[in-house]
């Protein structure tokens, strides 16, 4: 996105469902003249301990992406400038990790009914990384059940397919509170992906009342029409504007 040419505030590393380690992401950002990044792993702050070093040519903002529940919808909330030593944030992340493992175990149980026999130990997960469907799909390929990741994921792991188990979601108000209380800035991620797009303005109004500070206006999934709409809504409700690539490697 041109307006975010020198910053990328939405990146996933191998500590969640990205393929690159934080060190590789940092090297790539510096080589590509990016001046500011935030690694926003799903439900994880582990990468933040790796990126604490100071770099002359790169500002790294501590970040996270949380999956939340709002009126039976999934909303993703980004948190920037979080204090990774905050006890409430640590407790939240720990609970999310426990729930992720439970979900993965349920998915593996479902897959065994179709003679796809995988165990937790078969999933290649870095220490302190969050485990998820991407790790299962990779294991399905490695064990020879599928030829490629996309086929494995789409055949068994998306909603409506036999391996799917709904993910655990936190209440959106709790997530916004924890981000704010940890010194962070809560941002609504990729609003263009909300399946009831007509409700976005009402969602923004309500979330602002509970402490939302901004909107991810610039995202690869957004059309120019989306960008214009969300930019204008951000200005209308005095919310900050952010953007990022949602890079996974």
Residue ranges, per PLM feature:
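An N-terminally biased module of ancient metal coordination in phosphate/nucleic-acid-related enzymes
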Residues: 1-74, 156-158, 162, 171-178, ...
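Extended substrate/RNA-proximal surfaces in nucleic-acid metabolism proteins
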Residues: 53-202
């Amino acid at each position: 996105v041109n307006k975010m040419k020198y910053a990328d505030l939405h990146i996933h590393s191998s500590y969640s469902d990205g393929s690159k380690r934080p060190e590789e992401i940092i090297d790539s950002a510096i080589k590509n003249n990016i001046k500011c990044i935030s690694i926003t792993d799903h439900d994880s702050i582990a990468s933040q301990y790796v990126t604490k070093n100071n770099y002359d040519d790169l500002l790294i903002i501590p970040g996270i992406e949380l999956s939340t529940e709002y009126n039976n919808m999934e909303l993703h909330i980004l948190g920037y400038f979080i204090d990774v030593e905050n006890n409430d944030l640590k407790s939240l992340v720990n609970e999310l990790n426990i729930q992720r493992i439970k979900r993965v175990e349920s998915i593996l149980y479902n897959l065994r009914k179709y003679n796809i026999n995988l165990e937790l130990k078969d999933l290649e997960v870095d220490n302190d990384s969050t485990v998820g469907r991407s790790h299962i799909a990779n294991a399905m390929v490695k064990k020879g059940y599928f030829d490629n990741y996309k086929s494995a994921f789409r055949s068994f792991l998306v909603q409506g397919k036999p391996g799917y188990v709904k993910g655990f979601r936190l209440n959106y108000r709790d997530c916004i509170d924890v981000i704010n209380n940890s010194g962070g800035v809560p941002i609504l991620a990729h609003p263009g992906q909300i399946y009831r797009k007509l409700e976005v303005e009402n969602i923004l109004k309500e979330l602002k009342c509970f402490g939302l500070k901004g909107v991810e206006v610039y995202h690869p999934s957004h059309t120019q029409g989306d960008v214009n709409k969300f930019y204008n809504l951000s200005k209308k409700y005095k919310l900050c504007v952010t953007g990022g690539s949602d890079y996974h490697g």
